[in-house]
């Protein structure tokens, strides 16, 4: 157990730059390029495997990815507010995720509507499903 953890910033440290892509290129990216950039940026650990909720191993390819665009926890923020404000960024994210698996499920609240993403990877099928009800209706495990 830590009593404290101190992280010192190196004043001579260099910025890290990542490759960038326009919206039309995202769905055509190679899954290994996506994985490499997610890992280098530290975002790989945001993914969770089921049933044990661990970060996936590098190189692992899921049968499907579930994007939970709802939260039914009491007093939870409605993610649709942010998604609607940044719809292009949300769709770009779905296009990138589509390169990682053959199926992507976007799960949203029954009262919300999401326009379908314009372009996904050629090998991917993206499905939209709506859910209603109180908690735990918004949990990924419930959607699976």
Language-model regions: role of each:
Residues 2-144:
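Buried, small/hydrophobic-residue-enriched core segments of structured protein domains
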């Amino acid at each position: 157990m830590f009593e404290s953890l101190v992280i010192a910033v190196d004043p001579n440290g260099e910025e890290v730059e990542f490759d960038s892509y326009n919206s039309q290129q995202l769905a055509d990216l190679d899954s290994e390029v996506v994985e490499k950039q997610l890992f280098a940026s530290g975002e790989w650990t945001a993914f969770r495997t089921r049933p044990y909720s661990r970060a996936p191993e590098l190189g692992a390819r899921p049968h499907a990815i579930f994007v939970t665009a709802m939260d039914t926890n009491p007093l939870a923020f409605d993610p649709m507010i942010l998604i609607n404000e940044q719809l292009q960024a949300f769709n770009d994210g779905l296009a990138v995720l589509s390169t990682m698996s053959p199926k992507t499920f976007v799960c949203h609240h029954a009262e919300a509507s999401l326009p379908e993403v314009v372009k996904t990877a050629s090998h991917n099928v993206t499905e939209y499903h709506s859910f209603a009800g109180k908690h735990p209706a918004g949990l990924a495990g419930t959607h699976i």
